[in-house]
Amino acid sequence: MQARFHPIWVQLPSKLQDALLPYAGNDDFPAMLTAEQAKSIKKACGFDDNTLAVALLPLAAASSLTPISHFNVGAIARGESGNLYFGANMEFAGVPLQQTIHAEQCAITHAWLLGEKRLASVTVNYSPCGHCRQFMNELNSGTQLEIHLPKQASSTLDHYLPDSFGPNDLGITTLLMDPVNHGYKLETTDKLVLTALDAANQSYAPYSNSYSGTALLGKDGIIYPGRYAENAAFNPSLPPLQAALILMNISGGDCLAIERAVLVEGKHSDLSQRSATQSILAALGCSKFDYYTF
């Protein structure tokens, strides 16, 4: 079992420990459960979907990186596939607070990067902040996305974000998590660059058309892709580096052990991720940064 889960594990109900151990007990546990694994755990514990998601929140929060607030938040995104994806808040010392990743963003992006096509629900320790409500409003689940909190009645996003402004108001029909391929190409055989290019081709930027993707090579040899996720309200947009850091951290990697990073974006885009990406990477101790444009 990964060390980050040890402190919280003993606090879980024994029945849940027994049901989870075959999956979470492995060092390569990817902080997600397949639909079949979730079904097995629900049967063993007598849980329904919502009860299981709430029970998993402490385990999800164990992946938080909070050097500034020391306040850990966990989230579980349930895909329409039945898969459960963990999420946790992430902070980075030495960079502006605006670069913080919220637990809901983490869980949603985790699901998106692993190929989930639509979410059924998001479960979180605390009521979603306005930033996250607006971020979720970009999803193809729409305002009927279910939001679950411990010891509270379930509601939909429409309840948390009434009279919302979102992609529909701007005539956007392809939404976040809808499968896309923008078709950009680069002449290279560099695996890390090709991974970043693939991420850019699956990125979501309907407002600026500034598609971008990153790829991080961890010192453990694992490659982590990240896609840009734009938002109708602009500020809640998630940069591609943060998406890659989400996958790196939630998968058990070390965000302070990045061997090399690549950013790929359009040469004539209205905005660029380059300077912000370099700045954050420097704060994380990564100096090997390559930049490519299509």
Curated annotation (Swiss-Prot):
Reported cofactor(s): Zn(2+)
For Zn(2+), which residues are the binding ones? Answer: 102, 129, 132
One GO term under biological process is: cytidine deamination
Pfam families per UniProt:
dCMP_cyt_deam_1, dCMP_cyt_deam_2
What are the catalytic residues?
A: 104
Q: Which CDD domains match?
A: cytidine_deaminase (cd01283)
Which UniProt keyword terms apply here?
Hydrolase, Metal-binding, Zinc
Q: Which residues bind substrate?
A: 89-91
- Note describing how the cofactor binds: Binds 1 zinc ion.
Look at the named UniProt entry and state the broad enzyme category this protein falls under.
hydrolase
- Which InterPro entries does the annotation name? APOBEC/CMP_deaminase_Zn-bd (IPR016192), CMP_dCMP_dom (IPR002125), Cyd/dCyd_deaminase_Zn-bd (IPR013171), Cyt/Deoxycyt_deaminase (IPR050202), Cyt_deam_dimer (IPR006263), Cytidine_deaminase-like (IPR016193), Cytidine_deaminase_bacteria (IPR020797)
| Catalysed reaction equations from the record | cytidine + H2O + H(+) = uridine + NH4(+); 2'-deoxycytidine + H2O + H(+) = 2'-deoxyuridine + NH4(+)
Q: Which part of the chain is the CMP/dCMP-type deaminase domain? A: 48-168, 187-294
**Which EC number(s) are documented for this chain?**
3.5.4.5
Any one GO MF term held by the record is: identical protein binding
Name any GO cellular component annotation.
cytosol
The family annotation for this protein states:
Belongs to the cytidine and deoxycytidylate deaminase family.
Could you give the subunit structure recorded for this chain? Homodimer.
What is known about what this protein does? Answer: This enzyme scavenges exogenous and endogenous cytidine and 2'-deoxycytidine for UMP synthesis.
Full protein name: Cytidine deaminase
Origin organism is Photorhabdus laumondii subsp. laumondii (strain DSM 15139 / CIP 105565 / TT01)
